[in-house]
């Protein structure tokens, strides 16, 4: 059997040293929590389909410090490793690890379904198409392995005591980063007005909106039309999985074009949930991803 040799780093995460190939599939993990979950789900589904081990390369987080690995807050299955940067495998002392499939586009990349052990993948994989065959298992593994904070437990009690709707407002780098703002459309207040009106039409009971945002002051000021609304601002950037769990605990979800709240809505276990999503996620029409919004989400 082909083998990846691992040694434990000072943080307890194995470090890849040398290997000609490996007995499993290797997926790169990068970016924020929403993208990390898409990458894990596609990776895990691939390893299940092949019946082989899963190795998750987390070197990206050593190079980009504005994001943190959050997968270890979940019950994921696989080996996390970091170590020699991939380009060093060109050196004679570090033979090339595996053939790489790199895909950051928006259509379904069929190459992943022809994966073989020993291959390495880097991509976003932003569609449930990649893991739909293993939905229940992915749901079980993408559940928290760490307890919620006391503040989050108090919010959960509020959520469970009423008909709750999670509303997520994504601004952050969509506004502040010029490169990102050229790619992603920003959901304006009129989107949330239309989405909340649509949801109220479909729900017979009075609802309470729980408002989540990376700019909670702006969201509170500009979404006053929601009416019965509770802003949630108790976790910050260091524990994003807590906000994700709180949004998933609501009865219904209104999401922007954000993979973070996409996962909260997808993980929502309510069989009668209503999820409202924007129809447009990208500014450029040629970047449109028709596969990112599941069939049971409603677009406005």
Residue ranges and their predicted role:
Residues 52-63:
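A short beta-strand-loop structural module common to alpha/beta enzyme folds
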Residues 36-48, 192-196:
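Histidine-anchored nucleotide/phosphate-binding helix
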Residues 201-285:
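Donor-binding and catalytic core of enzymes assembling or modifying cell-surface/extracellular glycoconjugates
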Residues 64-76, 219-227, 287-292:
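Short, aromatic/basic amphipathic alpha-helical patches
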Residues 4-16, 20-23, 63-206:
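Secretory-pathway luminal glycosyltransferase catalytic domains
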Residues 29-38, 65:
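A short, glycine/small-residue-rich beta-strand->loop->alpha-helix junction that serves as a flexible
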Residues 26-31, 182:
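Active-site rim elements
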Residues 6, 283-300:
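Leloir-type glycosyltransferase catalytic cores
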């Amino acid at each position: 059997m082909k083998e990846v040799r691992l040694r434990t780093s000072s943080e307890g995460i194995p470090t890849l040293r040398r290997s000609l190939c490996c007995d499993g599939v290797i997926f790169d993990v990068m970016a924020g929590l929403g993208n990390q979950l898409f990458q894990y789900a596609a990776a895990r589904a691939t390893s299940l389909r092949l019946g082989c081990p899963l190795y998750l390369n987390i070197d990206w987080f050593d190079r980009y410090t504005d994001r943190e690995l959050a997968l270890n807050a979940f019950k994921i299955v696989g080996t996390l490793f970091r170590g020699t940067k991939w380009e060093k495998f060109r050196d004679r002392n570090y033979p090339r690890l595996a053939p790489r499939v790199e895909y950051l586009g928006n259509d379904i990349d069929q190459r992943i379904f022809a994966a073989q052990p020993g291959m390495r993948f880097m991509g976003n994989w932003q569609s449930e198409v990649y893991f739909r065959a293993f939905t229940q298992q992915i749901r079980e593994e993408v559940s928290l392995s760490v307890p919620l904070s006391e503040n989050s437990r108090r919010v959960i009690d509020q959520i469970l005591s009423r008909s709750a709707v999670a509303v997520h407002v994504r601004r952050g780098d969509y506004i502040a980063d010029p490169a990102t703002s050229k790619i992603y459309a920003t959901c304006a207040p009129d989107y949330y007005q239309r989405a909340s009106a649509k949801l109220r039409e479909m729900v017979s009971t009075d609802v309470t909106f729980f408002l989540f945002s990376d700019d909670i002051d702006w969201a509170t000021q500009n979404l006053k039309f929601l009416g019965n609304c509770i802003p949630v601002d108790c976790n910050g950037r260091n524990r994003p999985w807590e906000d994700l769990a709180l949004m998933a605990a609501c009865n219904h979800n209104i999401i922007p074009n954000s993979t973070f709240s996409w996962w909260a809505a997808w993980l929502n276990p309510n069989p009668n949930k209503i999820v409202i999503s924007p129809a447009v996620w990208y500014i450029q029409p040629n970047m449109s991803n028709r596969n990112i919004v599941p069939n049971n989400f409603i677009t406005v």
